[in-house]
Amino acid sequence: MGILDAQPAADIEMLISANCHIGSRNCELRMEPYVFKRRADGVHIINLGKRWEKLILAARIIVTIENPTDIIAVSSRSYGQRAVHKYALHTGAREAISSRFTPGSFTNYITRSYKEPRLIIVTDPRTDSQAIKEASYVNIPVIALCDTDSPLQYVDVAIPTNNKGRHSIGLIWWMLAREVLRLRGTLANRDVEWGIMVDLYFYRDPEETEKDTESEQKALEASGNPAGQFGSVPVTSDWEIAAQSTGAGIITNVASNVQSVGNWDENFGVETGVPSDWAADSIQQSEIQHAQNWN
């Protein structure tokens, strides 16, 4: 039980700050062993010690898979889509199925999205029920992040946690990836900190990202230092002035030449003595040649 008692105090502080211990008002029968108590407002509190035990168990199961590409992370919930992609990137998993799960991905070999994983990890058994159901048909083990109201049917390992908050989901996926890397030997021991920040696993709203970008651009414009953005650099260099002056000179020269030439046909006829009507000239030459042939 040494490894179970070695939960760092910093991890406990992060779990509490991310509200990983806050469950829902409802509680499934098979989730009662993971509930610490029930508050006066009806919200169930999840036992963090039980969560740590299940997290270690899930990490050990993941490490037993020889080929990491045989593991698939699934998240139909938007708050977990960024987390599953980061988990697949850092642990070498085959891929992450985010957004909607395509029916038949595990059972219908005719579809292009057909896969044969040896293990799947889901964010929410309720939103990812299609993936869990298909995994049960082909005997694929399932690890799931389960809240107090999550159904545990066809779930082999349940990690009790709050699977509805953006911070709690990202933190649990980050801890799971860190523990997997430690068991594989990528990280020496628990005293060595992982260089990947937990913020990378958090969901980011696209609107908030756009607002941050706009605020940065406004700050650069206000400071008068546009070095951070190429698009904000005003093009007022000597090249533009030289190009404008050169272009103006060319236009002036062309206009003067046109005025000096005047009528092209008149000048052409005066200088060379050749009529400007090319069609009449060709007719006269043909008539002269025809008369010579008769003679």
From Swiss-Prot:
One GO CC term, this protein: cytosolic small ribosomal subunit
Membrane-spanning residues: none
Swiss-Prot/TrEMBL keywords: Cytoplasm, Ribonucleoprotein, Ribosomal protein
Domain of life (superkingdom): Eukaryota
GO terms, biological process: ribosomal small subunit assembly; translation
Keyword Ribonucleoprotein listed: yes
Gene3D superfamilies xref list: Glucose-6-phosphate isomerase like protein, domain 1 (3.40.50.10490)
Region (Disordered): 208-231
Basic and acidic residues compositional bias, start-end: 208-219
Keyword Ribosomal protein carried by entry: yes
GO MF, one example: structural constituent of ribosome
Pfam families: 40S_SA_C, Ribosomal_S2
Subcellular location: Cytoplasm
Cited SUPFAM superfamilies: Ribosomal protein S2
Summary of subunit composition and partner proteins: Component of the small ribosomal subunit. Mature ribosomes consist of a small (40S) and a large (60S) subunit. The 40S subunit contains about 33 different proteins and 1 molecule of RNA (18S). The 60S subunit contains about 49 different proteins and 3 molecules of RNA (25S, 5.8S and 5S). Interacts with RPS21.
NCBIfam families the record matches: uS2_euk_arch
Stated role: Required for the assembly and/or stability of the 40S ribosomal subunit. Required for the processing of the 20S rRNA-precursor to mature 18S rRNA in a late step of the maturation of 40S ribosomal subunits.
UniProt similarity note: Belongs to the universal ribosomal protein uS2 family.
Descriptive protein name: Small ribosomal subunit protein uS2
